[in-house]
Amino acid sequence: MRFRWTLGLVFCLAAPRQAEAHASLLSSTPANGAVLSSSPLQVRLVFSEPIVADLSHVILASSSGRLVKLESRGDPHDVHAILAALPSLAKGGFRIDWHIISADGHPVAGSISFSIGALAAPPIRTTDAEHILDNHEPMVAGAALYPSLLRGLALSALLALCGLLGFAGYSSAPTRRQKRVCNWLSVAATILLAGHLVSWLVHVSPAKSLDSDIARSALSREVGLNELVRLVLTALAAWAVLLARRMRLAFAFALAAVLAGGVIGHPAAIDPLIAIPSKAIHLVGVAFWLGGLLWLVTSDAESGDVVTTAAIVSSVSLISIVVVALTGVIQALLFLAAWSDLFSTAYGLTLIGKAAGLISLAAFGAYHRWRLMPTPNPEGGTNLVGSVRKEIALMIAVVLLGGFLAYVPVPQMHAMNTKPTSQQGSR
């Protein structure tokens, strides 16, 4: 039965959805399919979210097969729009291919066509055009597979590091095993975040390759700087753990890196004044929850303090559960256009999966608190640690799902997905 439910969820997530996108094209000038009497001076594209104009690419294709890369810029009167000057055009059919990066760091590509003089067929897409704007990469439910997987793994390591350092810096002296785990987590988090950054730079590139010019532009803008700042803070935490041997300083850097994650992804584009602090607090709650569990399983079982440590961890976890649940609901209300999106969109179905995981984790916590912790004998402590290991495995799976969720397009009810407009949410 569980396998059937899992298979059903995967099938639903893999199915194409029409009501969701990262940033959707709302309108264009010239309009898609328009027939003009004379050559327009410029093209204007308006999207559903703020975009990073400096990272946009606009290409003009003529019926002769000629491709012209247009100089694009942001509309000074609208952060949702870009402008591109057009050369003088003769009569015939034309296609505008565009590739933009929305404020949440996700690439979107598409095209519009128009004619001058009389209705004409749009230019046939050539191999050269596909090379310039290559939107083909492994995708699941509209999310780029490799960046989302690396994001989930990196986030798991960073959150675990932050939480464990919090206990190590402000609780009793950490054991040798706990210090060793902190060392490995600091290295893993730094490497995985660096890998995610490279993967993201490839993801946002129009040609889906690591381009030095595009990387330089992306990292000099807020959308890329946020990723870079998080990586640097994590590297500083690793330095404090491995070289300086100062747990509290390492915790400060790791906590700052976790908080920096609040401005990355969907919150940067959708109600940021509420979404950013909500996500930041959400991540901190998960960090202390996961870190507490790791602190418990890495404690010295022979010292006889497992149950005492479990009581402290249980109290922290209870607070974390409440914080994570409340902030999760707030983000769901911001990102879901309607409650029906929970069951009709990939984002909603993924959110249901994450919520089910959190409920299961809460059930684990209740089982530990009221069934295993009251057991006074050593066997109870052993059983508790074994059960907590299972809870950690489930929590990592939920965090991986959260990393995937950050790349899944949120529902867009107000997007103008008209039939003649060709658009791809980096699919």
What are these regions (language model features)?
Residues M1-R4, K390:
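Positively charged n-region of N-terminal signal peptides that target proteins for export
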Residues L36-S38, D75-H77, L89-K91:
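Surface-exposed coil/turn segments at beta-strand junctions on protein surfaces, enriched
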Residues T6-A14:
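Bacterial N-terminal signal peptides
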